[in-house]
Every structure is written in C-alpha cells, then in structure tokens.
C-alpha cells in the first residue's frame, strides 16, 4: 500500500534492535484517514472470506481493526492485555511475548462475544515474530472458531513471523512489507505487479 509506505518513509524512525517507531500515525498519534484507507484495503483483500468478526490485541491494533470492521460491517473484539474488573470470568486466554517491550502479557477475550460459527479476521499493527497473532490463534483454537486470515499493517519480512504463520496455513496479507532496517533506513519489499 503506497500511501502507508510513504507515511513510514516520512514519519517512521528506526531505533536500535530492528525497531520501527511509527507513533506519529499508528501507535500513539493516529491518522484516521490513513486508518480508514487501511480498513478499506483489508476489507477488499478479504472480501470473499465471509468474515463475521475482526479480532486484534490492544492497543495499537485497535484503530486499524475498527476501520476494518467498519468497512466489512462486522463487530470488532480486542484482546485485553490487562485484567478488567468488568471482564473477570468466562475468558479465553493466551500468553503473548512482546518483541518491542520484552515482556509477556496474558491476553484475554470474553467467551460472551465469541460464537463457534464465527469466521474471524485477525488484525495487528506489526508482524515480526508473530507472537500476537499466535496468541489470537490459540484463543481461536480454544473457542473453536475459524480464522480466515491475518491482516498486518507493517510486516518485518526479515523476521520469521510471516513464514511461521504460512507454515500453519494462515493467510497473511501485509500492507507494507519492510525488507530491511539496516543503517537506519527503511527498505520495502516489492510486491507483485509493482515496478
């Protein structure tokens, strides 16, 4: 998605440890027009998947997930990372390691909002090692729902997440594919049909 790549080039910052900081438009300050376009793009890519719910993990996945749900006309569920006083029983849970924060969080989704007939699209802001998506897959397995794929805003192609998900049969659609962050520069992988 060229618009997203341009935002990354303009506002993204490469930090030590192969971290790409995009807090100017995605995970602190949010560009709602870009998020709307991201949601429309995911909806177009998965238009024939008969999706009934969109899932993500709080908090950076919420904006693109909500816009995807809006474009598809389906509800959005975000897995919580922290216990809530209002959501304290009847939960599906999984442990997820955060690459950027170097911590493990227990994510949870209420059984109340999950139906065994659901066809779920997973949305995440980044795909590096695939831990957040893997956690959502574990919850989907516990719930007995079908995952139709994973929509990723920014994929780090030089890390194993996408290949590991593909090996499990998960369809991955990434809007920006970063091939390298070497020397503080963001390089993108060319996709089929691009010059």
From Swiss-Prot:
Primary location group: cytoplasm
Binding of xanthine, residues: 20, 27, 156
SUPFAM superfamilies referenced in this protein's UniProt entry, alphabetically: PRTase-like (SSF53271)
Keyword DNA-binding: no
Subcellular location: Cytoplasm
UniProt KW DNA-binding keyword: no
Binding annotation for 5-phospho-alpha-D-ribose 1-diphosphate: 128-132
GO annotation, cellular component aspect: cytoplasm
Catalytically driven reaction(s): XMP + diphosphate = xanthine + 5-phospho-alpha-D-ribose 1-diphosphate
E.C. numbers: 2.4.2.22
Gene Ontology biological process terms from the UniProt entry: purine ribonucleoside salvage; xanthine metabolic process; XMP salvage
Recorded metabolic or biological pathway in which this protein acts: Purine metabolism; XMP biosynthesis via salvage pathway; XMP from xanthine: step 1/1
InterPro entries associated with the record: PRibTrfase_dom, PRTase-like, Pur/Pyrimidine_PRTase, Xanthine_PRibTrfase
A GO MF term: xanthine phosphoribosyltransferase activity
Taxonomic superkingdom: Bacteria
Keyword field: Cytoplasm, Glycosyltransferase, Purine salvage, Transferase
Family: Belongs to the purine/pyrimidine phosphoribosyltransferase family. Xpt subfamily.
Full protein name: Xanthine phosphoribosyltransferase
Native source organism of the sequence: Limosilactobacillus fermentum (strain NBRC 3956 / LMG 18251)
Gene expressing this chain: xpt
């Amino acid at each position: 998605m060229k618009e997203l790549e341009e935002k990354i080039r303009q506002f993204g910052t490469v930090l030590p440890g192969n971290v790409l900081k995009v807090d100017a438009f995605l995970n602190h300050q949010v560009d709602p027009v870009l998020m709307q376009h991201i949601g429309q793009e995911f909806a177009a890519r998965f238009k024939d998947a008969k999706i009934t719910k969109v899932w993500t993990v709080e908090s950076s996945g919420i904006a693109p997930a909500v816009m995807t749900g809006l474009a598809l006309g389906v509800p959005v569920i975000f897995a919580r990372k922290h216990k809530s006083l209002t959501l304290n029983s009847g939960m599906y849970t999984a442990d997820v390691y955060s690459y950027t924060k170097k911590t493990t969080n227990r994510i949870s989704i209420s059984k109340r909002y999950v139906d065994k007939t659901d066809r779920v699209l997973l949305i995440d802001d980044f795909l590096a090692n695939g831990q957040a998506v893997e956690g959502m897959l574990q919850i989907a397995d516990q719930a007995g729902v079908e995952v139709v794929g994973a929509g990723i805003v920014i994929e780090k192609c030089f890390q194993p997440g996408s290949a590991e998900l593909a090996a499990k049969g998960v369809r991955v659609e990434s809007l920006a594919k970063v091939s390298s962050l070497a020397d503080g520069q963001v390089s993108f992988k060319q996709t089929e049909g691009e010059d």
